[in-house]
From Swiss-Prot:
Organism for this UniProt entry: Bunodosoma cangicum
Protein name: Delta-actitoxin-Bcg1c
Job description of the protein: Binds specifically to voltage-gated sodium channels SCN1A/Nav1.1, thereby delaying their inactivation during signal transduction.
Homology family: Belongs to the sea anemone sodium channel inhibitory toxin family. Type I subfamily.
GO cellular component: extracellular region; nematocyst
Length: 48
């Protein structure tokens, strides 16, 4: 999958730690949670 930035990764410009995985449809898989809050964002940023 494609890495995405969770809210807990912080708003840093350089050296972002992308700990989430991008899911475009259907929300996060079972056992995962959406780690990205509000804002203009396509899909879901999911984390185990």
């Amino acid at each position: 999958g494609v890495a995405c930035r969770c809210d807990s990764d912080g708003p840093t410009v350089h050296g972002d730690s992308l700990s989430g995985t991008l899911w475009l449809t259907g929300g996060c898989p079972s056992g995962w949670h959406n780690c990205r809050g509000s804002g203009p964002f396509i899909g879901y940023c999911c984390k185990k």
